[in-house]
A protein has these predicted regions:
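Conserved, well-structured core segments that form the ligand-binding/active-site neighborhood
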Residues: 48-173
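An acidic, phosphate/nucleotide-engaging active-site surface
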Residues: 9-73
Length: 174
């Protein structure tokens, strides 16, 4: 869904992070084409990127961090990369149809559906500190992602910047 929900925009987003074909040593295939891999019990379709679906194997990589719009055991991270990143625009629209209130609850349910019906092999979780520096890296086999990601998120939240006052009075004069 990033990059303006276009294949070209997604490549530009990756390039902004220094992830290029030259850096990787392989082609970057980007498209907005998806495959419906199944439906949830409530009838909601689950989508994944067509290229990823056809790949021999998938390794997800994502920064695990607090989300700005919702809280839960899964926020921004490997599960969200599977659900919204691999789901492309169609997947993002399906997931967001009930608003952010349900997103924290739905991420692990949809991620499990994806893990069970695609060739996701592993995930690489990246955590940052208060200075936006990578300070934690953990690899997880696909069967470990749902169990390990909440603890990884907790550890990244511990490294965020914070104001070290329990009680503070502030006077602002203009």
């Amino acid at each position: 869904s990033h990059g303006g929900a276009t294949a070209e925009g997604q490549v530009e987003t990756l390039t902004g992070y220094g992830v290029t074909e030259d850096f990787l040593g392989c082609p970057i295939k980007s498209s907005m084409d998806t495959v419906e891999i199944g439906r949830l019990d409530n009838g909601q379709p689950v989508y994944v990127d067509k290229y990823a679906y056809e790949a021999d194997g998938i390794i997800l990589c994502g920064r695990v961090k607090a989300h700005t719009a919702f809280r839960g055991p899964y926020e921004s991270g490997v599960c969200k990369m599977a659900v919204i990143g691999m789901g492309k625009q169609k997947g993002a629209e399906a997931v967001h149809r009930d608003g952010f209130y349900e997103l924290g609850k739905m991420l692990p349910i949809i991620a499990k559906k994806i893990f069970d019906n695609t060739k996701v092999m592993a995930g690489l979780a990246l955590g940052e500190n208060a200075f936006d520096q990578t300070c934690l890296i953990e690899s997880m086999l696909v069967e470990e992602i749902l169990d390990k990601e909440p603890d990884f998120l907790r550890r990244t939240k511990e490294r965020l910047g914070k104001i070290y006052f329990d009680n503070i009075d502030v006077l602002v004069v203009e």
